[in-house]
Amino acid sequence: MSTTARLSLMLAIVAVMAVAAAQTTHVVDMHITPVEGQPTPEFYFEPVGLLIEPGDTVDFVALSPHHTATAYHAQHVKSHRVPDGVEPFSSPIVPVGEVWSYTFTIPGTYDIWCGPHEHYGMAMRIVVGEPGGPAEEPVTDFSPVGVYAISGLVLNDPALASSEIVARGGVSWYDLDPASKVMPETP
């Protein structure tokens, strides 16, 4: 092998290693947690807000049963709350202790929900690189084809504003206002 060929091969290997090193894997746990004094437990992603870079992967880990990680996408017959050009994605129901991974390549703001637990508030926001896209708008449709029930309140919580996620790098479920986690009582 010539010196030029060896040098080219070494540079290619270094470039591949640099790209691989720049990509990060983040962990989001999927929980059901009993709450003292309440009949219904809390269903949530932790963290509930996350800043990542394009090319990063998120491992969604089921710590309790019957969770999915599903994009709010028009092709799922839901409000479209992911950047333009993002295909619809959803995990299957992830068994307890198992992981489902998704690599985010398109910059912008992604709203994600758990299929079985959306009505309990199990939604989250991921900012990939820079905020942008339809998820930057407040949730206004709280119907089953919008952002259903408590999940809309969760995504409208001020702690999940993209600017907050960018400033903090991540937002814990416990940083949300407790009023964002329950349906308001109707008179």
Residue ranges, per PLM feature:
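Extracytoplasmic copper-binding redox domains, predominantly the cupredoxin/blue-copper superfamily
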Residues: 22-187
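Bacterial N-terminal signal peptides that target proteins for export
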Residues: 1-9
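Bacterial N-terminal signal peptides
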Residues: 8-16
